[in-house]
Swiss-Prot record:
PTM characteristics: Contains six disulfide bonds.
Organism annotation: Dictyostelium discoideum (Social amoeba)
Signal peptide residue numbers: 1-19
Keyword Signal found: yes
Annotated TM spans: none
Function (record text): Has antibacterial activity.
Name the UniProt record assigns to this protein: Lysozyme C
Chain coiled-coil ranges: none
Assigned GO CC terms: cytoplasmic vesicle; cytoplasmic vesicle lumen; vesicle lumen
Gene: alyC
Family: Belongs to the dictyostelium lysozyme family.
C-alpha cells in the first residue's frame, strides 16, 4: 500500500514538473489542440517554407503566424498582450510539439513584426515566456491586419467571436486537425 501511494505521489510530481502535454497530437510532431484559456507563449519565426502556400517575406511589416494545424490556413487571429493586439493571418504550420513541451505551454509562432509590436523586443523565444491571448477573428471582422488596442468590453467580444468562429471551422472540419480523421 505504501509503495502504491509513493508511486502515485511520484507520478504526480513528475507530471507537474513536466506540465504541458498535448491533448491532440497531429502530423507526427505537432499539436492540433487549441488552448482552452486562449493563453499561449509568443515566439517568432521567419524564412521557412510555408504549409499554406507561398512563404511570406521577412522584410517589411508583415503580420503572419504559424499554427495552421490548430486554426486552419488563411484564418485570421487576434493576438493580444494586455490591451495591445495585432490581427494576423495564418500562413504556416507549427511549432513542433517538442518545442511546446519544453516551453511547458502551447505556442503561437508569429512574424518578428508581431513580436516587436506586442513586446517591444527584437525576438521572442519560448524561454522568454511572453504570454499572449489568441482568438480567431469573426468572419465579419473588417479590421485590417496589424496592431490595434482593445477595451475590456472589446476583449470580451473577441472571446465570443472566437467561440463562434471555432464552432464554424470545427463544423467545416478545417481546424484542430479534423482533416486527419
Amino acid at each position: 500500500m505504501r509503495i502504491a501511494f509513493f508511486l502515485l505521489i511520484l507520478s504526480i510530481i513528475v507530471g507537474l514538473a513536466y506540465g504541458y502535454s498535448c491533448p491532440k497530437p497531429c502530423y507526427g510532431n505537432m499539436c492540433c489542440s487549441t488552448s482552452p484559456d486562449h493563453k499561449y507563449y509568443l515566439t517568432d519565426f521567419c524564412g521557412s517554407t510555408s504549409a499554406c502556400g507561398p512563404k511570406p517575406s521577412c522584410s517589411g511589416k508583415l503580420y503572419f503566424t504559424a499554427d495552421s494545424q490548430r486554426f486552419g490556413c488563411g484564418k485570421h487571429l487576434n493576438l493580444c498582450r494586455g490591451k495591445k493586439c495585432v490581427k494576423a493571418k495564418v500562413y504556416d504550420a507549427g511549432p513542433a510539439e517538442w518545442v511546446e513541451k519544453d516551453a511547458g505551454k502551447m505556442i503561437i509562432d508569429a512574424s518578428p513584426t508581431i513580436c516587436h509590436e506586442l513586446t517591444g523586443g527584437s525576438s521572442c523565444g519560448w524561454s522568454d515566456k511572453f504570454e499572449i491571448t489568441a482568438t480567431v477573428t469573426s468572419l465579419t471582422d473588417s479590421r485590417p491586419l496589424g496592431p490595434f488596442n482593445v477595451t475590456e468590453e472589446e476583449m470580451d467580444q473577441l472571446f465570443i467571436d472566437h467561440e463562434i468562429a471555432m464552432a464554424q471551422c470545427e463544423a467545416e472540419k478545417t481546424c484542430n486537425g479534423f482533416d486527419l480523421e
